[in-house]
Curated annotation (Swiss-Prot):
InterPro entries: DHS-like_NAD/FAD-binding_dom (IPR029035), Sulphoacetald_Actrfrase (IPR017820), THDP-binding (IPR029061), Thiamin_PyroP_enz_cen_dom (IPR012000), Thiamin_PyroP_enz_TPP-bd_dom (IPR012001), TPP-bd_CS (IPR000399), TPP_enz (IPR045229), TPP_enzyme_TPP-bd (IPR011766). This is Probable sulfoacetaldehyde acetyltransferase. Gene3D superfamilies: 3.40.50.970, TPP-binding domain. The gene is xsc. It catalyses: acetyl phosphate + sulfite + H(+) = sulfoacetaldehyde + phosphate. It is found in: Cytoplasm. Residues 359-383 are annotated as: Disordered.
Amino acid sequence: MKMTTEEAFVKVLQMHGIEHAFGIIGSAMMPVSDLFPKAGIRFWDCAHETNAGMMADGFSRATGTMSMAIGQNGPGVTGFITAMKTAYWNHTPLLMVTPQAANKTIGQGGFQEVDQMAMFEEMVCYQEEVRDPSRIPEVLNRVIEKAWRGCAPAQINIPRDFWTQVIDVDLPRIVRFERPAGGPAAIAQAARLLSEAKFPVILNGAGVVIGNAIQESMALAEKLDAPVCCGYQHNDAFPGSHRLSVGPLGYNGSKAAMELISKADVVLALGTRLNPFSTLPGYGIDYWPKDAAIIQVDINADRIGLTKKVTVGICGDAKQVAQQILQQLAPAAGDASREERKALVHQTRSAWLQQLSSMDHEDDDPGTEWNVGARQREPDRMSPRQVWRAIQAVLPKEAIISTDIGNNCAIGNAYPSFEQGRKYLAPGMFGPCGYGFPSIVGAKIGCPDVPVVGFAGDGAFGISMNEMTSIGREGWPAITMVIFRNYQWGAEKRNTTLWYDNNFVGTELNPNLSYAKVADGCGLKGVTVDTPAALTEALAKAIEDQAKGITTFVEVVLNQELGEPFRRDAMKKPVAVAGIDRADMRTQRRM
């Protein structure tokens, strides 16, 4: 069948149902984007490519469907680097389209030329460059399939002079593989260990959400009366109201989850790669059960046993593996110490929820006084925990939320609770600042009838705030964005108070900036609040207005209390050896 290369490209997108593209328009992609309206593909023209990539991540995580990121070759697609690595560690299947400098001039250092394959090699699960115009549909189909199989972004690189050529090809067929279901022997061994366990604990990771395995994990938990922890930043991997839900592990997570998993004799780590940051000690508890039998289930075999000693490794889909383990459990599975375990889970969960609801302030380490001083300097300002409680009071149960990286968002890690998956978007293990805002826009595009609320500190928000100039245009959906204003890079400032004797370098933000006024200037709505009651009222109104098509930025002024440092494991106090003296600075010779 004869068609142009761009027609072939778009027809393959249609075959796969890819209806949304995020990026900035550029000449190298215009032959394709020209066909988007006819094809039923919406192009979301963003203010920056990094934000575009994070919108695509938020869209796909919220919907479970694939979207596309596309930009101009060279300085356009370089903006996708952070976003693609973020999506990679968020296990988000995305299509990244990188038009390349013309094939006949590659290697001559021409306009907007860079080696785009080398650039993204570590950012995607698969990449392929088109070598001949006739192979565009074949390669695109394969790249899309590889993204699904790898559960991560995949890249197609296309020299721009391959467009507007006539080719005679048949469109490729879609070949989908069944997800692996795990090995029978490993599943039988896992079922035996769980059947004999006296204190089984289930740890649900992102794979439970991605694989739609929440119900299956719940059935296992109820059969065993096993408490269920969620992985770091995966609070939506188990219903928070369930009697066996004990909250997230990891940084600023649930003390109940940490205390209970520390008692486990068998841990079923379901759909998780057990990344090391997610199991670091918290609240002074080194909770990972070093003598427990660990059953790790992950669809990627390379990640099983990578960070923890594993007794049984199962390469398989979380849903199918959980179903099979449940079927093979012994009739008396979970009976050993069942009543004592149920009572302890209830007591520990209740005590933590009560403690969490009464925690108002952050502690100082011995020998430091920053948090005490912050409260004394601004006694009328809210603390981060008071802010999070006010937020939880009005956040709709069905809402999708996003959080950014940083101090104030991190303090809130234990607070959000969900009844279903695909409700919690967090930056993940790449940890980029600036994620909260664009990702929630992407989620709203994918789920227009669901209320969405994004959260970011003032430093992180400043990285992606240029999207305020794009989302007020016709056709863009309304969102609600909460910005925590403490006028500092809080996480780095906490490090400085602990290890660098309050020698603050680069930690202070502009106190004269008003994001609410910037929102007004962009034709959006900006509100500033400084009390819990005002925050609750403003957030409730913003969510109500969102349904009417009004975007609101709620700027929350709070005190400068600082939470637990992110990397206590990686920091230490510096020691002067040679010493540094300003007098040693020399004047440079001009070029």
